[in-house]
Design a protein with these regions (language model features):
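N-terminal Rossmann-like NAD(P)+-binding domain of SDR-like oxidoreductases, especially those catalyzing
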Residues: 1-183
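Short, intrinsically disordered, charge-balanced linker/junction segments flanking boundaries
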Residues: 193-197
C-alpha cells in the first residue's frame, strides 16, 4: 500500500505519518508538502531514514509536480491534510486560502481520477458548520448539520468538501471526509491556542 500524505510536515499530517509508519511498517508513505509557515521539515526527522518514507517538497496547486509524483509512486490512496488553516490569516489574505484549499484539492482530485486511486480522504474542519450560539449550551454539531461558513477559511474548506463530494457523485471516485474540531498535541504550530497558553 502506497499513500500520498499532503501537508505531512504540518501538525496533524506529521502525526498521521508517524502513526501510519508505526502501525503499518510495510506501507510506503509519501509526504508531499510545500513547507509554508506551518510546515516543519525537522518534525519529520525521526522518519527521514525510513526506507518506506519519502519527502517531496511541492505545492498541491502545481499540477505538473503532483502528476509527476503520482506517475512515479502509483499511490493507492491520498490523504489530504494540505491547507491554509488559520482563520485570522484568511481574513487578512483570503486569496491564498481559496487557491490552496479549493484549487489544490481540485488538482489532487483530478490526479486521483487519472491514476485510479482506490481512496481519497479529505481532512476538513468543523469550521464549515459555523458558530453555535453561546447562550445555547444544549446545541451541538452533528454530521447532518448544514454548512454555514463564517470566514474565508471555513468557506474555502466547505467548497473543497463539496468539490470532493461532487467528484464522488460525478466520477465515482471513492472518497471520505473528516471534519475534526481543534486538535492539540506534539508538533502543534506555535500560533495556535494551546501553545500560546
Amino acid at each position: 500500500m502506497t499513500i500520498i500524505v499532503t501537508g505531512g510536515a504540518g501538525f496533524i499530517g506529521s502525526n498521521f505519518v508517524f502513526h501510519m509508519l508505526n502501525k503499518y511498517p510495510d506501507y510506503r508513505i509519501i509526504c508531499l508538502d510545500k513547507l509554508t509557515y506551518a510546515g516543519n521539515l525537522s518534525t519529520l526527522a525521526p522518519v527521514m531514514d525510513n526506507p518506506n518514507f519519502r519527502f517531496v517538497k511541492a505545492d498541491i496547486c502545481d499540477r505538473d509536480a503532483v502528476y509527476q509524483l503520482f506517475e512515479e509512486e502509483h499511490p493507492d490512496m491520498v490523504v489530504n491534510f494540505a491547507a491554509e488553516s488559520h482563520v485570522d490569516r484568511s481574513i487578512e489574505n483570503p486569496g491564498i486560502f481559496l487557491e490552496t484549499n479549493i484549487m489544490g484539492t481540485s488538482v489532487l482530485m483530478d490526479a486521483c481520477r487519472k491514476y485510479g486511486i482506490k481512496r481519497y480522504h479529505q481532512a476538513s474542519s468543523d469550521e464549515v458548520y459555523g458558530d453555535l450560539p453561546l447562550d445555547r449550551p444544549d446545541l451541538f454539531f452533528t454530521e447532518e448539520t448544514p454548512i454555514h461558513t463564517s470566514s474565508p477559511y471555513s468557506s474555502s474548506k466547505a467548497a473543497a468538501d463539496l468539490l470532493v463530494l461532487a467528484y464522488h457523485r460525478t466520477y465515482g471516485l471513492p472518497v471520505s471526509i473528516s471534519r475534526c474540531s481543534n486538535n492539540y498535541g506534539p508538533y502543534h504550530f506555535p500560533e495556535k491556542l494551546i501553545p500560546l497558553m
